[in-house]
Amino acid sequence: MAKSGKKYLQALSKVNKLKSYNIDDAISLLKEIKFVKFDETIDVSVNLNLKKNHTVRETLVLPHQFMKEKRILVFAKGEKAEEAREFGAAYVGDDDLINKIKDGFSDFDVVVATPDMMKDVGKLGPILGKRGLMPNPKTQTITNDLKGTIASLKKGRTEFRANKNGVINFSVGKSSMDSKKIRENYDEFIKELLKRRPSDLKGTFVDSVYVSSTMGPSVKIDFV
C-alpha cells in the first residue's frame, strides 16, 4: 500500500531528498519524524549492481535482537529427533509432520531438516518453497548439527538475499531501540553484505542504500 496522508507528507517534508545522510543522523531523523503509535521496524534497502548470474545470499546473527523468537520445525528421525526436541524445536517429526503440512499446517517460521530426510521433505517443495522455507544448505538448514543450528536460530539468525532486481530489504531494529544498537545491527548487516561481493564483479557493488521505518519516508545513506 502506498504511503500517503497528511502526517506522512509532514514527515516527508523533513527529509532532504537532495542529501545523503550518515547512518547515525538518518536513524535520529527516523525517530524524530515518527508519527504512528506502534513500534515501527527500521528497514534497510540496498540496491546492488549485479549481473543475472550473480547470487547474493547470506545468514547472520545480529548483535541486538528485536524480533519475536522463531517457531522452529525440524524434520528428523530417531536420535536426531530427540536432539531437536531437547534443544527447543517447536515441532519435530518425519512422515507424520510431512502429512500434517500437506493438510494445511503452517504454524511455524523456519524449517530445518537432516540430510536423510530431504528425499521426503522435497515433496513439500510447492508448499514450503512458496513461503521461502524450504531447507537449503546455503542457509544452513539442511544439517546434522541440530544443536548448533537451533541455538543460532533462537538467537535470531536471519537471512538476507538479493531479489531478481538486485535489491535487498533487511530489518535492523525497532524504533523503540537505542540508536546505538540499531547502528550496530546496521553495521553488522553491511559488513556481511560486503563479504558477498561476487568475485567477477567489476565496478561498484552497492549502488545505493536507504533506511526507512514501517510507515515513514526513506532516507538515503551516504555510503562509500
UniProtKB/Swiss-Prot annotation:
Alphabetical UniProt keywords: Repressor, Ribonucleoprotein, Ribosomal protein, RNA-binding, rRNA-binding, Translation regulation, tRNA-binding
Domain of life: Bacteria
One MF term in the entry's GO annotations: structural constituent of ribosome
Entries under CDD domains matching the protein: Ribosomal_L1
Residue ranges the record marks as coiled coil: none
SS bond list: none
Entry annotated with the keyword rRNA-binding: yes
Cellular component terms per the entry's GO annotation: large ribosomal subunit
Primary role: Binds directly to 23S rRNA. The L1 stalk is quite mobile in the ribosome, and is involved in E site tRNA release. Protein L1 is also a translational repressor protein, it controls the translation of the L11 operon by binding to its mRNA.
Protein name: Large ribosomal subunit protein uL1
